[in-house]
């Protein structure tokens, strides 16, 4: 069974754990740097990205997270987690982990649309997935090596680049575990490659 970590500094940690377990993998709440060694994949949950960055800095997680990103093990960022994975953030000079060749805008759906739900069609996952958007970012631009998995209107809301997956919405806040299951499959495939 693959072991998937959920970064436990802030955000929808418990809901991600439930979704990972419902998808047939073991979930670990990561609160210490050395736990990164023990997992096969990592979820960066939604939350408030500036608060999360402050906590990442406080507990000296940034370099270990960048090292994890270079290790070939899959990472999945939802909402604030997508912001952490992006190489370029509109209005900000520096990236956080900066693992994905994407440009992201924070709070991109505007204050009047603080939160809403939308039925999404997601490549590799299926139709009618209810995306829960809460002060959500979205992907403004992608490099050629990034696959766009889903759009809401003309805005890119789910993308994949090799072992990295990012979503604007919160898949863990529904009882539909298909997006988490898709990530679990990515982790299984990456683990199989390492074994060979």
Curated annotation (Swiss-Prot):
This is Pyridoxal 5'-phosphate synthase subunit PdxT. HAMAP family: PdxT. The gene is pdxT. GO terms for molecular function: glutaminase activity; pyridoxal 5'-phosphate synthase (glutamine hydrolysing) activity. It catalyses: aldehydo-D-ribose 5-phosphate + D-glyceraldehyde 3-phosphate + L-glutamine = pyridoxal 5'-phosphate + L-glutamate + phosphate + 3 H2O + H(+); L-glutamine + H2O = L-glutamate + NH4(+). In the presence of PdxS, forms a dodecamer of heterodimers. Only shows activity in the heterodimer. Keywords: Glutamine amidotransferase, Hydrolase, Lyase, Pyridoxal phosphate. PROSITE patterns: PDXT_SNO_1, PDXT_SNO_2. Catalyzes the hydrolysis of glutamine to glutamate and ammonia as part of the biosynthesis of pyridoxal 5'-phosphate. The resulting ammonia molecule is channeled to the active site of PdxS. One of its GO terms (biological process) is pyridoxal phosphate biosynthetic process. InterPro entries: Class_I_gatase-like, PdxT/SNO, PdxT/SNO_CS. GO terms for cellular component: cytosol; glutaminase complex. Belongs to the glutaminase PdxT/SNO family. L-glutamine binds at residues 47-49, 106, 134-135. The keyword Disulfide bond does not apply. The active site is at residues 79, 170, 172. The keyword Metal-binding does not apply. Its EC number is 4.3.3.6, 3.5.1.2. Transmembrane segments: none annotated. Pathway: Cofactor biosynthesis; pyridoxal 5'-phosphate biosynthesis.
């Amino acid at each position: 069974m693959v072991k998937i970590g959920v970064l436990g500094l802030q955000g929808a940690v418990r809901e991600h754990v439930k979704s990972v377990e419902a998808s047939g993998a073991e979930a670990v709440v990561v609160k210490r740097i050395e736990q990164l060694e023990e997992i096969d994949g990592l979820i960066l949950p939604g939350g408030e990205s500036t608060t999360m960055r402050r906590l990442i800095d406080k507990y000296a997680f940034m370099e270990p997270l960048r090292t994890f990103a270079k290790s070939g093990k899959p990472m999945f960022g939802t909402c604030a987690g997508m912001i952490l994975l992006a190489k370029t953030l509109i209005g900000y000079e520096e990236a956080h982990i900066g693992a994905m060749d994407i440009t992201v805008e924070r709070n991109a759906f505007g204050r009047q649309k603080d939160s809403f739900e939308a039925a999404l069609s997601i490549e590799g996952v299926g139709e009618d997935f209810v995306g829960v958007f809460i002060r959500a970012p979205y992907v403004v631009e992608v490099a050629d090596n990034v696959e766009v998995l889903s759009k809401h209107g003309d805005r890119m809301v789910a993308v994949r680049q090799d072992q990295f997956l990012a979503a604007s919405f919160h898949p863990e806040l529904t009882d539909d575990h298909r997006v988490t299951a898709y990530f679990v499959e990515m982790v299984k495939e990456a683990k199989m490659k390492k074994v060979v």
